[in-house]
């Protein structure tokens, strides 16, 4: 039996129950998502874009799915402590894949701004929700997105009206909590109306030793002149598998930063899709990982320049120790009408041991003739000369290796005012 079949059977048998416990508008695309999953199936290692991640193996185990929305006995405010010092945020929680609404933060948000659960948002702003939900993440191209759309019952929404600036970052913490192996299907929807500004930090944490499988679909809409920063920090566990897709649509003059950081995980696949659909739009896509033991991170990106005078900057850095495995496949597509495009892609990797492995495939696909584009990749090992010099100055070898590793992934181009994030 194919790995996706158990999830198709689950939905077929319990569709009424899934829909009954879900936010209303989330039920509309389920039938199409089911048909797409049946047609596409899961990606296989025969696919060039998934050759380093065995999706079927990851989804094959029998995970529990909380379709009844049973209450999880945990107070996230008691079990979570942020590792980032002096970080002032508006803090929200999702437990597995359910928005935690029993205790909400005191209102630090400007009037008209919404941050909270999908169900309440769809009841409060039904027209806005129907205009955006599912519109950036089509189910007809990726079986995992189709699976998520078919099964997701709740989510988190950030909505910022036109011209509103949210000074304090919004922080969403995804907590895994269960006594049995569990699957979570999460959605995040971000709607930035013209000339609005906000920042969202999403953190993943596991507090139990059982196996977790997460699918996550993030949709970001940036209106004309909007500024939005999205930070994704994964600090889960070696028993956690995550498949995440970030889909961004930008209008004229908008500026979006997407920053993914992986520090602790088991197997992670991150997909990034960015569309620059309005002139003078700017996208910054960057990522950093420090992996060891048997950790695995597979990153795929696709940036589309559809119109003239847009800029994209892409930088991913990885440090791999022990038997860690990393992969990066990035594509920049410059369409024929996208003259005066500036697009840059860089991948830098450090393998700290002979057993660590990194696979990289940067790509440019250009159909316009008046552009400035570049792409490049380097993969190397620790500088033994520098390591010897540091040891000769009294720094223990393990500390010297760590210092050199951290230095190799330091960021020099992030926005200076975001020092805490």
Where do the protein language model's features map onto the residues?
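N-terminal amphipathic, basic helical "cap/leader" segment at the start of enzyme domains
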Residues: 1-146, 315
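Catalytic-core signal marking the mid-to-C-terminal active-site face
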Residues: 22, 401-406, 414-415
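Hydrophobic/aromatic-rich, well-ordered segments within soluble, folded domains that form packed cores
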Residues: 27-43, 151, 381-403
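Short amphipathic alpha-helical segments with coiled-coil-like heptad repeat character
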Residues: 41-49, 166-167, 311, 398
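Short, surface-exposed loop/turn segments at secondary-structure boundaries that line and modulate
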Residues: 42-44, 377, 405-411
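Conserved beta-strand/loop scaffold segments within soluble protein domains that form the structured core
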Residues: 106, 111-114, 124-388, 392-395, ...
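Single conserved hydrophobic/aromatic residue that forms the stacking wall/gate
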Residues: 413-421
């Amino acid at each position: 039996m194919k790995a996706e079949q158990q999830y198709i059977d689950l939905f077929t048998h319990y569709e009424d129950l899934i829909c009954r416990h879900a936010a209303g508008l989330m039920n509309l695309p389920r039938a199409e998502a089911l048909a797409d999953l049946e047609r596409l199936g899961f990606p296989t290692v025969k696919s060039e874009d998934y050759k380093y991640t065995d999706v079927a193996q990851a989804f094959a185990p029998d995970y529990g799915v909380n379709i009844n929305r049973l209450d999880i006995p945990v107070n996230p405010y008691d079990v979570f402590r942020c590792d980032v010092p002096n970080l002032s945020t508006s803090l929200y929680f999702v437990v597995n894949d359910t928005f935690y609404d029993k205790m909400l933060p005191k209102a630090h948000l400007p009037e008209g701004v919404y941050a909270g659960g999908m169900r309440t948002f769809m009841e409060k702003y039904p027209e806005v929700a129907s205009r955006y939900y599912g519109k950036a993440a089509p189910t007809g191209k990726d079986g995992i997105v189709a699976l998520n759309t078919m099964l997701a019952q709740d989510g988190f929404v950030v909505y910022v009206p036109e011209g509103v600036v949210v000074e304090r970052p919004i922080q969403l913490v995804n907590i895994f909590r269960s006594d049995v192996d569990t699957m979570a299907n999460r959605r995040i929807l971000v709607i930035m109306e013209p000339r609005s500004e906000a920042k969202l930090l999403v953190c993943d944490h596991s507090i139990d030793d059982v196996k977790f499988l997460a699918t996550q679909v993030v949709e970001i809409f940036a209106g004309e002149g909007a500024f939005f920063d999205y930070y994704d920090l994964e600090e889960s566990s070696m028993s956690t598998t995550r498949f995440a897709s970030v889909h961004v649509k930008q209008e004229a003059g908008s500026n979006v930063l997407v920053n993914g950081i992986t520090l602790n995980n088991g197997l992670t696949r991150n997909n990034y899709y960015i569309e620059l659909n309005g002139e003078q739009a700017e996208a910054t896509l960057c990522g950093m990982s420090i992996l060891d033991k048997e950790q695995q991170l597979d990153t795929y990106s696709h940036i589309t320049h559809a119109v003239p005078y847009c800029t994209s900057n892409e930088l991913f850095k990885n440090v791999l120790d022990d038997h860690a495995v990393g992969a990066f496949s990035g594509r920049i597509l410059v369409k024929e009408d996208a003259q005066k495009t500036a697009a840059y892609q860089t991948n830098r990797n450090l393998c700290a041991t002979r057993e660590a492995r990194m696979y990289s495939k940067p790509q440019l696909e250009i159909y316009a003739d008046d552009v400035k584009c570049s792409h490049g990749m380097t993969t190397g090992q620790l500088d033994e000369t520098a390591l010897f010099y540091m040891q000769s100055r009294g720094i223990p070898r393990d500390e010297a290796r760590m210092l050199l590793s951290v230095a190799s992934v330091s960021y020099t181009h992030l926005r200076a005012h975001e020092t805490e994030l």
